[in-house]
Amino acid sequence: MTKLSKRQLDILRFIKAEVKSKGYPPSVREIGEAVGLASSSTVHGHLARLETKGLIRRDPTKPRAIEILDEEVDIPQSQVVNVPVIGKVTAGSPITAVENIEEYFPLPDRMVPPDEHVFMLEIMGDSMIDAGILDKDYVIVKQQNTANNGEIVVAMTEDDEATVKRFYKEDTHIRLQPENPTMEPIILQNVSILGKVIGVFRTVH
């Protein structure tokens, strides 16, 4: 495989993902936002190097004309983290938690905090839609047993049911707040925090 820098891999990976999910490549601005580059000229420089290496082809007269030339180029395994997918958690009415690993899902290492235990859960329901978490999405969760007010968590209720909600510790109770104005919060005396949601993965059908 052609040797690429981590930034070039990130850019190539993002372009491939956008083409696969949307059917067309991202703009230079979108690439910059995705990989943390504020300067469009820096993005252009990386694209030029990818083009020189024969991995992409660009049409300078069009803003989104980026074609992947080598579809076999992929992320080296050393830059992939296999994250366990653990059952399903509701984002509507709680369902009984299933804590078994169903499969492992490869994620780019930049999406996974170093030295942290991370897992993924499939969402069922639409109570978190205003937070950008939709039915059938996968949430990426950093395993931890505490949370700050306002954080989105995976919480285990007193009935050993798991749910994804925004966490608030109030004077006499815990409030698990949905991000959907049509739904009521869950009020409990005690909950166990399984982890904090740090990302969302979505496939476009």
UniProtKB/Swiss-Prot annotation:
Its EC number is 3.4.21.88. GO terms for cellular component: protein-DNA complex. Disruption phenotype: 100-fold decrease in homologous recombination efficiency. The active site is at 127 (for autocatalytic cleavage activity), 165 (for autocatalytic cleavage activity). It is an enzyme of class 3 (hydrolase). InterPro entries: ArsR-like_HTH, LexA, LexA-like, LexA/Signal_pep-like_sf, LexA_DNA-bd_dom, LexA_repressor, Peptidase_S24_LexA, Peptidase_S24_S26A/B/C. Induction: By mitomycin, requires an intact dinR gene. An SOS-independent induction of dinR occurs during competence, does not require an intact dinR gene. Disulfide bonds: none annotated. The record marks 91-92 as: Cleavage. Pfam families: LexA_DNA_bind, Peptidase_S24. Represses dinA, dinB, dinC, recA genes and itself by binding to the 14 bp palindromic sequence 5'-CGAACNNNNGTTCG-3'; some genes have a tandem consensus sequence and their binding is cooperative. In the presence of single-stranded DNA, RecA interacts with LexA causing an autocatalytic cleavage which disrupts the DNA-binding part of LexA, leading to derepression of the SOS regulon and eventually DNA repair; autocleavage is maximal at pH 11 in the absence of RecA and ssDNA. NCBIfam families: lexA. Belongs to the peptidase S24 family. Homodimer. This is LexA repressor. It comes from Bacillus subtilis (strain 168).
